[in-house]
Regions:
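Acidic, divalent-metal-binding catalytic cores of TOPRIM
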Residues: 1-203
Length: 203
C-alpha cells in the first residue's frame, strides 16, 4: 500500500477587489485616461490607493497627491478640465463655512467648473475614516483643540507619539488594519465612489 499526503485545497482566487467591485478575470491596468483625481493629504491618498487602487488602475485613472487646498485653483487652471477631461478632487474636512468650502465653491463657479467635482469628508483627520474597532476602540477619542489631533489620538491609544516618525508608524498601523472597504466609514466610501464615477463617465 502506498501512502500519499492528502492534498490541500487550492484557495480560490479573490473575486472582488478591496473596494468590493467584482474583479474581472485577466483585467489589466489601462493606459492612463484623461480624467484625474486629486486627493488632499498624504495619508488620505495612501488610503484611497490601498482600497480603490485596483479599480483605478483598471479604469486608467491616475490619482495625484494634493498638498493643500490652497493649491487647488492653480491645479484646475493647469489641468484644464473639459467634457473629455474631467477632474475630481477629494478635500480634507470639507464642512459648510470653512475655507475649504469657499475654495471649492470658487472652483465650481470658475472656468472648467462644470467638469470639476470637489467633494470632501467631514473628519478632522482621515484616520477617523477607518472604523475605530479596527484599532480596538469603540470610538475615536475627542482631542482638545490645543493638542495636535494625531498626537492626542496616539496618546489616548497608548502609542508612541514623540516625533513624526512615531506618527508615521501609527498611521502605518492604522492603514494596515484596513482589510477592505467594509473597514471604512460610509462618508468616505461614498465620496470616493462619486469621484470615480464622475471622472470615468462616458462623454
Amino acid at each position: 500500500m502506498i501512502l500519499t499526503a492528502p492534498r490541500r485545497p487550492v484557495p480560490a482566487a479573490a473575486t472582488r477587489t478591496a473596494s468590493g467591485s467584482v474583479k474581472a478575470p485577466g483585467a489589466r491596468a489601462r493606459v492612463a485616461a484623461a480624467g484625474r483625481i486629486y486627493v488632499e493629504g498624504r495619508h488620505d491618498a495612501e488610503l484611497v490607493e490601498s482600497v480603490w487602487g485596483d479599480d483605478l488602475r483598471v479604469e486608467g485613472v491616475v490619482v495625484e497627491y494634493l498638498g493643500g487646498v490652497d493649491d487647488l485653483g492653480r491645479i484646475v487652471d493647469e489641468f484644464g478640465p473639459g467634457p473629455t477631461r474631467r477632474l475630481g478632487v477629494l478635500v480634507d474636512h470639507l464642512v459648510p463655512g470653512s475655507k475649504e468650502s469657499r475654495i471649492a465653491e470658487a472652483v465650481r463657479r470658475g472656468p472648467g467648473g462644470e467638469h470639476t467635482l470637489v467633494v470632501g469628508h467631514p473628519y478632522v483627520d482621515i484616520w477617523q475614516a477607518v472604523k475605530p474597532a479596527r484599532v480596538g476602540l469603540s470610538e475615536w477619542p475627542t482631542v482638545p483643540r490645543t493638542i495636535e489631533w494625531k498626537h492626542g489620538t496616539c496618546a489616548a491609544l497608548g502609542w508612541p507619539h514623540r516625533d513624526q516618525a512615531d506618527i508615521a508608524r501609527a498611521w502605518q498601523r492604522i492603514r494596515d488594519s484596513v482589510r477592505d472597504w467594509t473597514d471604512l466609514e460610509p462618508e468616505l466610501i461614498g465620496r470616493v465612489e462619486e469621484l470615480i464615477d464622475f471622472v470615468t463617465q462616458p462623454v
